[in-house]
Amino acid sequence: MSAAKPTTLYDKIWNDHLVHEAEDGTCLLYIDRHLVHEVTSPQAFEGLRTAGRKVHAPEKTLAVVDHNVPTTDRSKPNPDPESAEQIAALAENARDFGVTYYNEFDKRQGVVHVIGPEQGFTLPGTTIVCGDSHTSTHGAFGALAHGIGTSEVEHVLATQTLIQKKAKNMRVTVDGDLPDGVTAKDIILAIIGEIGTAGGTGYVLEYAGDAIRALSMEGRMTVCNMSIEGGARAGLIAPDEKAYAYLKGRPMAPTGAHWDAAMRYWDTLRSDEGAHFDHELRLDAAALPPIVTWGTSPEDVISVTGKVPNPADIADEAKRLSKERALAYMGLTPGTKITDIKIDRMFIGSCTNGRIEDLRAAAKVAEGKTVNANVNAIIVPGSGLVKEQAEAEGLDKIFVKAGFEWREPGCSMCLAMNPDKLAPEERCASTSNRNFEGRQGFKGRTHLVSPAMAAAAAIAGHFVDIRDWR
C-alpha cells in the first residue's frame, strides 16, 4: 500500500470541509464560523426574512458593529443617517435571528477581525468567512479565512455552506532575523512589493520560515491581514504553541477534554514534508528596512531611506502611466527623499495594527515627546478590550500627554465610512491596509507604515527612520 500523498495546510483544511465537488471543480464547503458586521449584512438578513428562512447555525455566527461607529462620544446620535440605519438594522437582525451581537456600548465591541481571535471564536483548522476582504487575518491561527460578498453572506447564514472553487498553493518563506525597527507590517509590505497586488491572484498563501515563526500572534495577524492586498484569496500560518497559548482560556475557546481533543487535531495542521506548492517565494528578513508606501497601491513600497521613484524609468507604458497618475494624486515629485515628506494627519488603528502590541510600540515612541503642531494624530484601539488593557497599562496617558487623541474602538480612518476622514489633499501616515485613491477620504493621501513609524512621523511632522529614533 502506497504512502499518502504529502499535502499542504490549505489542502488539509479544504479536504476536511469539502461537502461535495462537481465535475467542473465547483465545490460546496462547510463553514465553521461566520463573522458579521453592519455594512454587508442588511440585505442578507432581509433576504432570509423575505424567504421565511432562519439562520442555520446562530451559535456559529458572531455580529459586531465596527465600520460605521463613531470613535468619539457615543452618547450622541450618529451624525450620518445611513450609518445609524445600518447599525440599527444589525441590532434588529441579530435579535430577530438569535445571533450573538456586540453593540457599540459593549466593551467586547471592536473591529470584527480583532474581536474574533480575542473571543476565541477564531480557531485553528476552521473555515471562517465574513463580508469583509480582510477576513484573511484569521489565517494567523491556521484557519482558512476569506471575505465573501453580500449574496454569499445570505447563503452562509441560511445553509452554513459556501460554493467555491479551490485555489492554488503558494508558500512565502521569510527566514532570518528582523532588524531592530522592522516589524510584521514591513514584512507584508515587502512581500506585496515583491509580488505586486495581482501576484497572489488565484492562490492561498502560506507564510513560513524562521522570521514568521518568531512573530507574535499579533504580528502574524498583521501579515495574514494584508494577504488580500497581494491578490491572494487567503493567508495561512501553521498553528503552534504561540497560537494555543493565545487562545487558551478565551471565552469561546474549547475547554477541558474538548480543548485536549482540539489540540490533537491542531497538531496535524501543518504542510507535510514534500507537499507541492504551485509557487514559492523567499525573502531574507535581515535585509528588510522600515517601509513607507509612496503611491496609491500597496505595491508602491520603498525603504524609508529611499526617494520617490521616477516613473520615467519604467519601460512598460501602462505601468508608467499608472505610476505617473499615482504621483500626481499623491502630490509628490520624483527624487524627493521619503524623510522629507511632511504629514498632516496620523492614524494608528485598524484590523491591521490596532492591537495591544501595536499600541505599546507606538507608546514607546511617543513617551516624553510631543505631536508636531501641524499634525492631527489619533489612536483608535481595535476593540474595547484592547482599550481597557491599554488604559490599565497607562498607554492612554502617554498618548494624551504627547498630544495624540485617544478614541473609542472601530474601523475609524481605515476607510471613509464614518466621521474619521481626511480632507482633500491631507496627507496621512496610517497603520491601515489600503492606500487607494479616496480610501481615507475624498482626495486624501495615504502612506502605509508600521505603528512605530506612524508615531514617529506624527512627532517629527514628517517621515523618519525609526531605527534612528531617540
From Swiss-Prot:
Catalysed reactions, semicolon-separated: (2R,3S)-3-isopropylmalate = (2S)-2-isopropylmalate
Pfam families linked to this entry: Aconitase
UniProt-annotated binding residues for [4Fe-4S] cluster: C351, C411, C414
Gene3D superfamilies: Aconitase, domain 3
Top EC class of this enzyme: lyase
Family, per entry: Belongs to the aconitase/IPM isomerase family. LeuC type 1 subfamily.
NCBIfam families: leuC, PRK05478.1, PRK12466.1
UniProt protein name: 3-isopropylmalate dehydratase large subunit
Encoding gene per record: leuC
